[in-house]
């Protein structure tokens, strides 16, 4: 058994990773997942089985997540031109070129934290740049 697990699972296998990790961990298991992962009846079944997440942190800024093999390990910049350019009007359009710095991503992500045996409500917050949690405060009165 281990105290903690932090992982970015292959997204098609996330449910299997959650099931397995919750069995292995004494403390907590945290997963970086697309926000849309929550919106599924399959997830409700998983939460009934392993318990609901203790915490969800939505990444307020969309991270760039190009495949690591395309990034220079020292500079963090692209080490090659986009290998899959699209043709538009007879011209190749590249998403990036060698030496470019990755920009913002197009997908919303979140950290989901499971604690074995947790039965309370799920706490949800947002992380901004630098990993700082921004507390949710209602700015208008409910109707």
Residue ranges and their predicted role:
Residues 1-143:
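Class I S-adenosyl-L-methionine-dependent methyltransferase catalytic core
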């Amino acid at each position: 058994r281990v105290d903690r697990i932090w992982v970015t699972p292959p997204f098609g296998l996330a449910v299997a990773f959650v099931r397995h990790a919750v069995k292995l961990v004494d403390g907590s298991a945290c997963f970086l997942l697309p926000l849309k992962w929550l919106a599924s009846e399959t997830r409700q079944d998983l939460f009934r089985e392993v318990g609901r997440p203790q915490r969800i942190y939505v990444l307020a800024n969309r991270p760039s997540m190009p495949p690591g093999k395309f990034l220079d390990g020292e500079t963090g910049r692209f080490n090659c031109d986009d290998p899959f350019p699209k043709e538009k009007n007879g011209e190749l359009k590249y998403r990036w070129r060698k030496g470019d710095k990755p920009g913002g991503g197009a997908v919303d992500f979140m950290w989901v934290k499971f604690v074995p045996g947790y039965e309370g409500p799920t706490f949800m917050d947002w992380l901004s740049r630098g990993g700082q949690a921004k507390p949710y405060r209602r700015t208008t009165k409910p109707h």
